Amino acid sequence: MRITDDILYVGVNDHNIDLFEGQYIVPNGMAYNSYVINDEKIAVMDTVDAAFGDEWLKNIADVLNGATPDYLIIQHMEPDHSANIQKFLEVYPNIKVVGNAKTFTMIGNFSRDLKLADENKLEVKNKDTLTLGKHELTFVFAPMVHWPEVMVTYDSKDKVLFSADGFGKFGALDAEEDWDCEARRYYVGIVGKYGAQVQNLLKVAATLDIQTICPLHGPVLTENLEHYIGQYNTWSSYGTESEGVMIAYTSVYGNTKKAVELLAEKLKEKGCPKVVVTDLAREDMAEAVEDAFRYGKIVLASTTYNGDVFPLMKTFIEHLTERNYQNKTIGLIENGSWASMAGKVMRGMFEKSKNITWLETSVKIMSSMDEQNKADIEKMAEELM
């Protein structure tokens, strides 16, 4: 795939993977992106997962037609982007690996047998440039987006931002699917904790004339960049992307579920633009976390369990708070047959979260709904509108 006259795609698709980072379901696989900048000096941007080293090297050889690369630029050291450094050096022993100080420390930690000679290293600092000929690359450090060594690279000639894991998504490149959905799930799950750091990177990006974004996962972005950047701004500022209400629940014998179904019915009757109901025991946790960040209002409904809150609800809330969940309105429905604790526990788990607005109405069920519970659900629906 040719991106510009001089920039070519040499990445790979992975349709064998079932879990990304050991936890995220990827039914449409993953793409590990790598790029060649073909100039007087030739640069290769990042490597790919270890399982695809031979395919990647063949892709590079095919586009270079016998030419030899001069630089291997490592923007991010996660193994799905750096695992083939040694293999690359075996084929091209005279190249320079370009990275920052943290990059080279991590290379040593991940590849104990790889001893990079000084002549094979080019250490760069923030805002350093590298001239390939017509192309001048500027390296912009982006620590904790989402690892400490991350840097992005801007090519001023073709106005391309090589964005590391930023603007990435789940799914191989041959998967036909909506960008927003799988990019949102990727962002929230993997980068979501680091909103402040993403905001810092977006401020730098705003000073650049960007016409193309080349991420390490997902498609190359060439059109409607305002949309993609706008989405990243919303996600990283913990804003509301879509109007509506998410209801996340756990239910042991179905009584809490009945309360949730009644609330969803009332919201729809009142014209709520979107009601998303998620059974945390049966639906993908990453999808649930994604929706919790997407909508501005959420209702948590759960049972007391062993003097605590039901375990899957606890896990769900932990996923939210560890990703700096904030700027949301939350309502609570709790159920307990005696000594109900779920509401208190759920609320307490958000005590360090910023800018949380609690609904005045809460619902406390004793085993099964009574008329007062139904009235409270009606009132909660009104308050959510």
Residue spans for each PLM region:
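Metallo-beta-lactamase
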Residues: 2-5, 98-150, 194-200
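Conserved beta-strand hairpin/beta-sheet module of binuclear metal-dependent hydrolase folds
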Residues: 2-60, 64, 152-155, 159-163, ...
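Structural motif
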Residues: 41-43, 71, 135, 159-162, ...
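Active-site neighborhood of phospho(di)ester-bond hydrolases with catalytic His/Asp-centered motifs
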Residues: 45-47, 69-77, 97-100, 161-165, ...
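Active-site metal-binding motif and surrounding structural segment of the metallo-beta-lactamase
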Residues: 51-98
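Short acidic active-site motifs
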Residues: 84, 284-288
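FMN-binding flavodoxin-like domain, especially the glycine-rich phosphate-binding loop
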Residues: 173-213, 217-220, 262-278, 288-385
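Short N-terminal or domain-adjacent regulatory/targeting segments
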Residues: 214-241
